Each structure stands twice: as C-alpha cells, then as structure tokens.
Regions:
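Residue-level marker for buried hydrophobic side chains located in beta-strands
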Residues: 179, 207-208
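Walker B catalytic acidic pair
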Residues: 211
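Helix C-cap/helix->beta junction micro-motif
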Residues: 34, 141, 170, 202-203, ...
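Conserved core of the PLP fold type I
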Residues: 67-198, 214-230, 237
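Conserved PLP-binding catalytic core of the aspartate aminotransferase-like
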Residues: 46-49, 308-309, 321-329
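Conserved core segment of the aminotransferase class I/II
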Residues: 229-309, 313-320
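N-terminal small-domain helix-loop-helix segment of the aminotransferase-like
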Residues: 6-7, 14-105, 112, 162, ...
Length: 329
C-alpha cells in the first residue's frame, strides 16, 4: 500500500483519514469550556446515563483472587466461555463453549473475522444504512465494503433479491447482518434469516451477524429471529458482548459464537484461535467475573428497557401527525 509522506516519516495510506472537525465540534468545545449546561441526546456512554448498577456485586466479582494467576487460553478461559454458553442455553439456544471465542470488544471481533475471511481488497457486503464504525474497521483491515439495501418503505427489511444479485456479481468474502440494525432498530425476521443462510451457503459466503443490541426489543414479535446461532447451512459468526448486553463497556469483553456446518465451524475456530493467540487481549479479571456478571443481566437490562420505553413514548408524542419526522409503526 502506498505511503503518505509527512515530513521525514511515511505513514500508511490506510490511516490517511479526514481529521478536520465538523461545524458542531468547536461550538461544543466552547460551550463545555464555558461550563454551559448541555442536554446531549447523542450520549451513548451507559455509565453516564443515570443507570443504577449493582456496584458492590460487580466489584466483588472482579476481585477474585484467582485473577492474580495468569493462565492464558487463546479462545478465552473455559469458565468464561462456559458462562456464555450457559447464558445462551438459558434462552433456549444450544451452543458448545468450544464454539465460543472471547475478544476484548466487538470491534476486535470484526477485525479478527475480517482477517480470517478476507485478503486485502476483498469485498464484504454490509447493510445500508449501517453503523459508521464499519467503514473505519474495514479500512484498517484492508477490506472493501459494498452496500446492500435496507428497504425504508418496509421497516428497513433486507432486500433479499438484491443480496442474491450482489453475491453473484461481486462474490463477497462475507455478508454482514446487524440485528437489530444500527441505526434502523429493525430485527431480522426468521424468514429473512433462513433465506439469507440458504443464499450464502449456496455461494460459500460466511455470515457475520451483530446481535449486540438483541436483548432490547420493546415488543414481542413471533416472526423475529431470536439469534442466528444454530445449525443453519451457512458458516455463521454471531457477535455480542458486555458493552451492550450489560451496559458495561469499560469491562472490555465480547465474543464470537461460531455455528453452521460442523467441518467449517471447526476449521474457523482453529484459525481464530491462532489469531487470538497472537494478541491474548482479554484480561483475566473480567473472565473470572463473567459467570457472576451475566447473572446480573435481568436487573441491568430491566432499567435499560424501561428507559427505552419512556424515550420511545416521548418520541411518538413529540413527532405527532404534522411534525417534520414520523415514527414507523
């Protein structure tokens, strides 16, 4: 890759991004410098949103004396991987702890998977609209994103025909699905999941499914796909972690759950283990704490769901019937 000369030093072109501030950045800096009270509707840090965490329990779980001993496992400590598998089993989802690989974050999970599946310049299909971070992750990992359409007229559902055409045309190294979508909030339907899995299996295209916000649906929907983990025909990687599931991003723990055809899943895990062994990025205290932390999930998520319901009702009231925006049913 061509370098970019800055003085006497050459930097990679992949890091030549636009660092210029937008129009809001200097204004926000001035207001904060002047200690002007602000209502920030873009705040995404859950530790700053007034949630009440079981602090003493969390600290107790993190104070396990066994964390003073270092015994690394590239896939993640067995006690932690089994805790993740047990949490899924509690939801009626069967997966072996041997098909779970721990990471320090979802971003790291994406990086591992891009390295596993794609060579530099290879295409990856992503939904449009989607989370802006994907573009940065793709650039850092030397893959090229190609969008597929989410139909705004049908609650941002996936255009399955377009996905089929794109797969046949560009032959992507992976298909990325986000359920619920960010920023759309739309969950993958069971019928969509089954069709996507068939399409991708027929073309030998793995699926990466981001389910980090999956626990926060505000209403029941019998057609919703609870998860893409399962014995589908396509090799599938499901991402989740503590940042969203427990609103604890500072603990830095995510995971990849691998499912699909047994031979492909086993080979994917073998290769992922080598990638993870190169970094060994997940800290020991959070892995030892994970069984206890996951037991707190119902209490923490109840607060988040209540806040989401309140915010949703307020948005619906504020939008009205003649406002500049409308709420989808």
């Amino acid at each position: 890759e061509a370098g970019v000369l800055q003085g006497l030093f050459i930097f990679s072109a992949r890091t030549e991004w636009d660092a210029a501030p937008n129009r809001l950045t200097p204004l926000l800096s001035r207001l904060r410098a002047g200690r002007v009270p602000l209502i920030d509707l873009t705040e995404s840090n859950p530790t700053r949103c007034g949630l009440i965490f079981p602090d003493q329990e969390i600290l107790r779980f993190l104070s396990n004396p066994e964390s003073l001993t270092y015994d690394p496992d590239p896939k993640g400590m067995p006690v932690a991987r089994e805790a993740v598998a047990a949490d899924y089993r509690g939801r009626g989802v069967e997966i072996s702890s041997e098909r779970i690989l721990l990471t320090a974050s979802s971003s790291e999970a994406y990086s591992f998977l891009f390295r596993l599946l794609a060579a530099p310049g290879d295409p990856v299909l992503v939904p449009a609209p989607c989370y802006p971070l994907f573009e940065l992750l793709a650039r850092i990992n030397d893959v090229v994103l190609h969008p597929y359409t989410l139909d705004a007229g049908h609650r941002f559902s996936i255009d399955l025909d377009e996905v089929g055409r794109e797969i046949a045309t560009i032959r992507p190294r992976a298909l990325l699905v986000v359920s619920p979508g960010n920023p759309t909030g739309t969950y993958l339907k069971r019928g969509e999941m089954e069709t996507l899995s068939r399409i991708c299996a027929a073309a030998s295209v793995p699926i990466i499914c981001d389910e980090v916000f999956g626990d926060y649906a505000l209403a029941e929907d019998a057609t919703r796909a609870a998860t893409m983990i399962g014995p589908g025909p396509a090799l599938t990687f499901v991402l989740n972690g503590l940042s969203k599931m427990l609103a604890l991003p500072q603990l830095k723990l995510g995971w990849i759950a691998v499912s699909g055809p047994e031979g492909a899943a086993a080979e994917a895990m073998r290769r992922l283990e080598v990638i993870a062994d190169t970094f060994l990025s997940v800290n020991t205290p959070v892995q030892n704490a994970l069984p206890g932390l996951l037991a707190l999930r119902p209490r923490i998520q109840a607060q988040v769901l209540e806040r989401l319901a309140i915010n949703s009702r307020q948005i619906v009231r504020s939008a009205g019937s003649e406002g500049p925006c409308r709420c989808l049913p």
